[in-house]
Amino acid sequence: MGEIRRLQIGNVTLENNLILAPMAGVTDLPFRLLCKEQGAGLLCMEMVSAKAILYKNRNTEDLLTIDKRENPVSLQLFGSDPDIMSEIAKQIEDRPFDILDINMGCPVPKVVNNGDGSALMKNPKLAGEIIEKTARAISKPVTVKIRKGFDEEHVNAVEMAHIAQESGAVAVAVHGRTRSQFYSGKADWDIIRQVKEAVSIPVIGNGDILTAADVIAMQKQTGCDGFMIARGAEGNPWIFAQILHYFKTGEELPKPTFEEVTQMILRHARMQLEFKGEYTGIREIRKHAAWYTSGYRNSSKLRGRINEVETYEQLEALFQEVCGDMV
């Protein structure tokens, strides 16, 4: 059986090795707090551009907001200029995050076309310079998130993990897909095993963790030290509690009832409104509500109605109306 245990990342001790992955547009403060309540051992923030912080882009402040209830929390920076990355790391070090993560895995074209994210998988030398300068600039632990490679012709996760370790990173997270795969197809867990066998720093496996059984299978196949959960948490912050319960008791928790799902959606919505105001908060909760209700009877019809909601009261009324039709 896989192992849920404490994990040491530099000078930071995680109570367990279940980690909420950084997801742009998903892992904002309200969602992170919900995952923390369900037992996540580490929360990763949405990625933020080092250049955006440098140029004082007003949209970055929400991305940098941390609540003391979250800790430990990992702040993820992306960029491809070693000087800017290290300078921004110094500027933000006093903020209450525990770990600084460097994004070398984002596959989104506008990020890659700027030489950032997974574009750095094609430039290991530059990647090493970024890690080294950033790790030297701050006292907080620095980690790196990478992919299997840029494409199937350039699979270099082992090389990148070596470089990360030699450059001062204290852990590496490996997504078992190439950049060209984006999020399609099956994650290659064997590349995680290869990285684990090649480096001495903790290796965190990422890709296709949807259940406790997946954690067991990944640990057995790869020997990885931690488990990073991404899409498995979308609409399902309970996944952390479900996995922890299974490892503690050997039994699966029952799936939340639709009433419990509804209460979570409404609570999540209230948190979004408090954090971002009604206009933005309601628009943010729409996608979450679609994920929460996915798989239920009439969920596709409900999704269309969710997207028309403009206020919290409308959202609450909608779920009161449809409750009986969904189960």
Task: Enumerate the language-model features and the residues they cover.
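Alpha/beta catalytic cores of nucleotide-metabolism and tRNA/nucleoside-modifying enzymes
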Residues: 1-6, 10-14, 18, 24, ...
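Glycine-rich, positively charged N-terminal anion/phosphate-binding segment
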Residues: 2-8, 23-98
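N-terminal small/glycine-rich loop or linker at the start of catalytic domains
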Residues: 7-19, 51-72, 106, 110-114, ...
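Hydrophobic faces of well-ordered beta-strands that scaffold small-molecule active sites
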Residues: 18-22, 43-45, 73-77, 100, ...
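Active-site beta-loop-alpha junctions enriched in small/polar residues
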Residues: 23, 48-50, 78-80, 105-107, ...
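Alpha/beta enzyme core
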Residues: 37, 86-116, 125-201
